Structure formats: structure tokens, C-alpha cells
Amino acid sequence: MAATTAETRVFLEVRGQLQSALLILGEPKEGGMPMNISIMPSSLQMKTPEGCTEIQLPAEVRLVPSSCRGLQFVAGDGLHLRLQAHAELGTKLISMFNQSLQAQECCTFYCQSCGEVIINDRKLLRVLPLPSENWGALVGEWCCHPDPFANKPLHPQENDCFIGDSFFLVNLRTSLWQQRPELSPVEMCCVSSDNHCKLEPKANTKVICKRCKVMLGETVSSETTKFYMTEIIIQSSERSFPIIPRPRFVQSVIAQCLVQLSSARSTFRFMIQGQDDKVYILLWLLNSDSLVIESLRNSKYIKKFPLLEDTLKADSSSAWSAVKVLYQPCIKSRNEKLISSWESDISVHSLTLPSATCLELLLILSKSNANLPSSLRHMNSFQVAFLKI
């Protein structure tokens, strides 16, 4: 294969379950030099009159050069080809909810944005997932007696933690009324017109970090507080606070939520809405087995993949598992008809997050989309993006 370029952009997406890869070599620039491209199982090699550039693939990715097919040149994009690939999908997940919470363990709740301790050294005796929204209907269908819990909310007892789709429910009765220091970094801000901060919880009360003023959650009752997974890190009290870039954390939490919900409920369409009940994004999960190369190193320089940058330090051997999604922004009254259609569809699942986090997620999606090769940015009327797991 030959092309003319002084510097070629490389895009590589490997599908683990399909054992296939899409390789795109950026469109040559005018005035470039001839270049021969060689594909080997563990590397890509580009030869020009000036020398040879070799891009090493991560150890978990191996290409099958003889399977190359579908070779075509796409104007404005570059050289496209597909080939077989072997990839190991093992990836180090950011520990956030189910993975980090263990019963009988003392945990500390941190504000993810600034690292402030929100709840210190809380021993969780029970860590339980909340049932799905249709659990009451299932009880009525399968039980021969009336449901004793019909229309009653589930509230955690002291030292309980209930896990929802995108939030934790924690009982803070003791901490609130006995003025324990574990809640001292958190202030209760009432959303009423007088805007006074009161200790007495109300249904419309936000929980805000005193240090960075980020909304962490809201009070559900006088004893129960909801913390959003995108705002809180829960660690064993024996471990220190992990420093994770905010965009990296947000997309990992959302990606893992999408994967778990799609697996548990066979739903692939999601409405991302704020705590103000406004819909910000419509998401459609395409697949969760993509492996995307983030950084490519050669002898002269390091080419960084802009696709998923935000970034932890990446090296030539790193690859990240990612979910591939279609999305539609819904801010400024966009896509109102589509929102109405999705709201009436029982197969669509809603995820509620702080409004500021919804905008953060939209920015992450837009940045991912803008850095994709132009031919991959749209599918039908939706935009395409990757969220790093």
C-alpha cells in the first residue's frame, strides 16, 4: 500500500467479541512524500525517503495482516481497511460503586471534584442494590397476597447503603442530629426563595460540598440522603483518596452504568436528565466491546490519539476499553419531538444526574465526536462518540 504524507494520523478500533478491527490512516496532505505502509501482528510500519516510523500496538492487541479486506480510500478521511484482530478485553475499571462497597467494611466518602471528606470512617453493615422500578408490579403478579410495601419508599437503616442506577442512598440520621464531625464538610442548601441554610432536611434540599461548592446529592427524607455516583468516590478507610481527572471519572461512571443496565434490563436507549427534570442528552448504546488505541509512539515523536484525551498519562502500550454510543443533544429546546417519543417508550431508561454533570457529559461526547475521523462522526441522524470505561 502506498500513500503520500508527511505525517499520517492513525485510528484503530478493535471489537473484542467480533475479533475484528477497523484501521484508518489519515488522508495524505499535499506536498507530502511517498510512503509505504506495512501491517504486522504487533505493529504498523511506515517507510518514507526520510526513514522508517514504527508504531507498536499494545500487548493485548494482535492483528492478522493476511485477513485485510475492504480496502478503500475515503475523501477527507483517509485509507480504510478492515482485518481480523485478537484482543483481550481485560481493563482496569475505575472503582466507583458495586466494586468498591463491601459490607462489614469501614468506608470514607469523598467529593470526587476536590477530595474533601464527606463521610468519614462509616462502617457499612449492609450494601444492597435497589430493585428495579417495576418491582411492585412483579410482586403483584407473582405473590398470592397483597404487597405490604406497596407505594412505600425504601429507605436505608443506619449503617446501610442502597445502590441505585446512578446514586447511593445513605442513612445520615445519627450524623445530622448528633452533629458528628463526619458531615462537617457538607452544607444543606435549601432551594427556597429565602435561600437559608438549615439543618432540618427538606424534600428540595441539595447537598453541596463546602470546599468546591459542587452539588453532591440531595436529601430524600429527614434521615436519607442521595449521593450521585458521578460526584462521590467511596474508598476503604485504609486507602487514600485517588486522584482521577474529572472527565475520565465521569465518562467511566456513565459507561459502566450503561453497560450494567443494558445487561440487566436489556435496554439500550437512555435519557440523561438533570435533577431539574430537564432532558439534556439522548443516548443509544451501540456496543461495549471496543478497544481503542489512545497513544502511539515512534522513534521520533509521540502521537497522541485525541479521541479519548482528558487524560491520564498514556504510553505506547496502552489501550482503553470503551463503549460506543449514539447521542443527540437536547439543550436549548432541541429534539423536542424525539424526546417526547422516547418518554412514551417503555424500553427507554432515564438516568438522573446533577445538571452540571449532564453538561460535562455532553462536552465529553462532543469532544470525542469532533476527534473521530469525519466518516465515523454520524450515523443516521445521531452523532457518534466513545466513552472510556
UniProtKB/Swiss-Prot annotation:
InterPro entries noted in UniProt: UBQ-conj_enz_E2-bd_prot (IPR019193)
E.C. number: 2.3.2.26
Record-annotated disulphide pairs: none
Keywords: Acetylation, Cytoplasm, Metal-binding, Transferase, Ubl conjugation, Ubl conjugation pathway, Zinc
Compartmental location: Cytoplasm
Record region (Interaction with UBE2C): 235-257
GO molecular function, one term: ubiquitin conjugating enzyme binding
Residue span of region HECT-like: 353-389
Entry text on domains: The C-terminal half (AA 188-389) is able to bind cyclin-B and shows a self-ubiquitination activity (mono-, poly, or multi-ubiquitination) in a HECT-like sequence dependent manner.
Identification of the protein by name: E3 ubiquitin-protein ligase E3D
Gene that encodes it: UBE3D
